């Protein structure tokens, strides 16, 4: 599907930033809930990444759930010209500073 490159870049940037995208199965929806673009563009762009093996798709209750794979991280890092130390949000583990470290036996 032909779509403007700016729209594709928005989708790819959001996917890399978050690591996960949720899209409602509504092709006529004017705008995606989180990305400032058409919902159809989001579904089709991520469908393309799924066919290349960069994204894993799960469908449940009229919603598509897209998760980024290891190959997808490398592809988007190259596509968006990002350095190695930048990783998706799903790869970052937040640690509660008040919580003590777990003891290993």
Curated annotation (Swiss-Prot):
Entry's Gene Ontology molecular function annotations: RNA binding; structural constituent of ribosome
Post-translational note: The N-terminus is not modified.
Keyword Ribonucleoprotein attached: yes
GO CC annotation: cytosol; cytosolic small ribosomal subunit
InterPro entries registered for this protein in UniProt: Plectin_eS10_N (IPR005326), Ribosomal_eS10 (IPR037447), WH-like_DNA-bd_sf (IPR036388), WH_DNA-bd_sf (IPR036390)
Keyword field: Cytoplasm, Ribonucleoprotein, Ribosomal protein
The keyword Ribosomal protein is assigned to this record: yes
Subcellular location: Cytoplasm
Pfam families linked: S10_plectin
GO biological process assignments: cellular response to amino acid starvation; cytoplasmic translation; positive regulation of protein kinase activity; positive regulation of protein phosphorylation; ribosomal subunit export from nucleus
Protein function: Component of the ribosome, a large ribonucleoprotein complex responsible for the synthesis of proteins in the cell. The small ribosomal subunit (SSU) binds messenger RNAs (mRNAs) and translates the encoded message by selecting cognate aminoacyl-transfer RNA (tRNA) molecules. The large subunit (LSU) contains the ribosomal catalytic site termed the peptidyl transferase center (PTC), which catalyzes the formation of peptide bonds, thereby polymerizing the amino acids delivered by tRNAs into a polypeptide chain.
Anything else known: Present with 7650 molecules/cell in log phase SD medium.
Assembly and interaction partners: Component of the small ribosomal subunit (SSU). Mature yeast ribosomes consist of a small (40S) and a large (60S) subunit. The 40S small subunit contains 1 molecule of ribosomal RNA (18S rRNA) and 33 different proteins (encoded by 57 genes). The large 60S subunit contains 3 rRNA molecules (25S, 5.8S and 5S rRNA) and 46 different proteins (encoded by 81 genes). eS10 interacts with GCN1 (via middle region); this interaction is direct and promotes GCN2 kinase activity.
Family: Belongs to the eukaryotic ribosomal protein eS10 family.
Protein name: Small ribosomal subunit protein eS10B
Protein source organism: Saccharomyces cerevisiae (strain ATCC 204508 / S288c)
